[in-house]
């Protein structure tokens, strides 16, 4: 073990989840999530990682034609067994009927157990937007219904939906997130019914099973998927940044059955009215707010 290690704290007011996901694409194996940032530690210099984040910021700004906030601070610290220290600092959380915990913590018998290890996941339930999503799943998701998780990340929301009896489809534009969702579902003893790498409109691309194997290159060839979901869902949830929600607004609306529920989360308070305006053709049932983060519940028809 080297005498010192490097620490980098990364924060973004409007793209935190994207930078977290990108860190795993770069090969980062563990992060520590804080309220408004995340920390990366390594015994090797993190200069190349910093450069990659800055280039990723530029790419996001070009793609979404908007300013992407990014703050990076670095330090050198005396080495210690920080992985063990970090694990001890991660506490389970109770959200409605769900109990989200890392694998090294004990379960609670009276609650629905969800195991997510922050070291390998893009979301562990501690972030305000994910926390609100779990509360809304607890309240609005119905046993036997069909669900779509858009931007599944760690798979935490898909796992919650499966554990209360829904048929679940999930997608993410990041292949690392798809793989993480598959692994986390296996760890939790559930199977996401169908999962693909891409957005809502890419459901006709390669479909993966829980072993990560491609089932079909064409969704229309998969009769079980079509019979179960018909491309419209009783319950759709999207916990992603505002800019992506705005890009996907029509696809999100079209993916909800008449009388179905759409949950939008990952939205900063300053974009609250914009989201309400964009989805004004749906019935707004509820708005939750936790700190600067806002979640919306809409009903179609």
Curated annotation (Swiss-Prot):
Give the organism, scientific name. Campylobacter hominis (strain ATCC BAA-381 / DSM 21671 / CCUG 45161 / LMG 19568 / NCTC 13146 / CH001A)
Q: What keywords were assigned to this record?
A: Cytoplasm, Methyltransferase, S-adenosyl-L-methionine, Transferase
The name under which this protein is listed is: Ribosomal protein L11 methyltransferase
- Identify the GO cellular component terms for this protein: cytoplasm
According to UniProt, the reaction catalysed is: L-lysyl-[protein] + 3 S-adenosyl-L-methionine = N(6),N(6),N(6)-trimethyl-L-lysyl-[protein] + 3 S-adenosyl-L-homocysteine + 3 H(+)
Which Gene Ontology terms cover its molecular function?
A: protein-lysine N-methyltransferase activity
Query: A Pfam family in this protein?
Result: PrmA
Binding positions for S-adenosyl-L-methionine per the UniProt entry: 130, 151, 172, 239
Query: Is tRNA-binding given among the entry's keywords?
Result: no
Q: Which domain of life is it from?
A: Bacteria
Q: Which GO terms describe its biological process?
A: methylation
Q: Does the keyword S-adenosyl-L-methionine apply?
A: yes
User: What SUPFAM superfamilies does the record tag this protein with?
Assistant: S-adenosyl-L-methionine-dependent methyltransferases
Q: Which InterPro entries match?
A: Ribosomal_L11_MeTrfase_PrmA (IPR050078), Ribosomal_PrmA_MeTrfase (IPR004498), SAM-dependent_MTases_sf (IPR029063)
